[in-house]
């Protein structure tokens, strides 16, 4: 059976890169005594795949890993086993069974992701910058420079910026694990295209906006938290998008 596990990554774990996070989760499965399926051959490894690697320095309430298991667990049992053995900053939120097959893996389904950007004290946008941003995201065309292994490429990110809202209400600011949560107005919510098709990072949106205003990007100004990751079940026709959280594609195990 294949299980999709949803977990949060907070606190100091935001400084851990993707490969180290993979090793961390493998050790967690071993410590928890979960009966994981291993590949065959000379170098057996756990059969598991990660949906959408998180950038270093970001926190998340929506990390996903698909794991093949040799025996059945209830969702509650598996979540409890993992949380009892989890390191500080990692908290398992849910576990659900998903169909086998390459087409059902989380990494092949990712199409959209939500983020909250929380400004550090003293770096908040004033009302004039907020209004400028609201006008900027409404443009029909927004050119940004995307960097990849093949070099730099100018792309229009406007069609892939699904939503951009400056919060009028206080929201939680994700900080170090032993700090008390802060609440502050002015957080920025972004919903962006994600995955292997067209992946738009929230820091690319911010850097492009700042550069368009003739200023230098300042990554220290804000903290980024990934709120949710979605699959698109709507098909390829224009206007037919139907986004569903990856965990929503699974079945609760009794």
Regions found by a protein language model. Give the residues of each.
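Ordered, amphipathic secondary-structure segments that act as subunit-interaction surfaces
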Residues: 61-116
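Short beta-strand-to-loop capping motifs
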Residues: 7, 67-73, 117-123, 190-196
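Short, charge-patterned binding micro-sites
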Residues: 38-69
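Core RNA-modification/binding signature centered on pseudouridine synthases
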Residues: 138-254
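A contiguous pocket-lining binding segment that forms or flanks enzyme active sites
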Residues: 117-153
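Short amphipathic alpha-helices in soluble, non-transmembrane regions
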Residues: 78-86, 126-138, 205-206
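Extended, well-folded interaction surfaces typified by the phenylalanyl-tRNA synthetase beta subunit core
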Residues: 6-8, 12, 16, 20, ...
């Amino acid at each position: 059976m294949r299980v999709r596990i949803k977990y949060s990554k907070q606190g100091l774990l935001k400084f851990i890169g993707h490969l180290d996070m993979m090793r961390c989760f493998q050790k967690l499965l071993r410590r928890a005594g979960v009966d994981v399926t291993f590949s065959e051959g000379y170098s057996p490894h756990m059969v598991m795949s990660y949906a959408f690697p998180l950038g270093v320095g970001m926190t998340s309430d929506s990390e996903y890993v698909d794991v093949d298991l040799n025996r059945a667990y209830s969702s509650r049992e598996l979540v409890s086993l993992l949380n009892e053995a989890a390191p500080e900053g990692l908290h398992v939120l849910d576990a659900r069974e998903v169909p086998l097959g390459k087409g059902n893996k989380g990494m092949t389904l990712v199409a959209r992701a939500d983020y909250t950007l929380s400004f550090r004290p003293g770096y908040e946008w004033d009302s004039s910058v907020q209004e400028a941003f609201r006008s900027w995201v409404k443009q029909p065309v927004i050119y940004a420079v995307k960097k990849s292994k093949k070099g730099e490429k100018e792309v229009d990110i406007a069609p892939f910026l699904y939503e951009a809202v400056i919060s009028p209400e206080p929201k939680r600011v994700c900080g170090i694990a032993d700090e008390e949560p802060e609440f502050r107005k002015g957080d920025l919510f972004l919903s962006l295209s994600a995955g292997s098709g067209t992946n738009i990072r929230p820091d690319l949106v911010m850097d492009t906006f700042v550069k368009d205003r003739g200023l230098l990007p300042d990554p220290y100004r804000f903290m980024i938290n990934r709120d949710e990751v979605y699959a698109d079940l709507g098909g390829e026709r224009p206007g037919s998008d139907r986004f569903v959280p990856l965990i929503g594609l699974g079945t609760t195990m009794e």
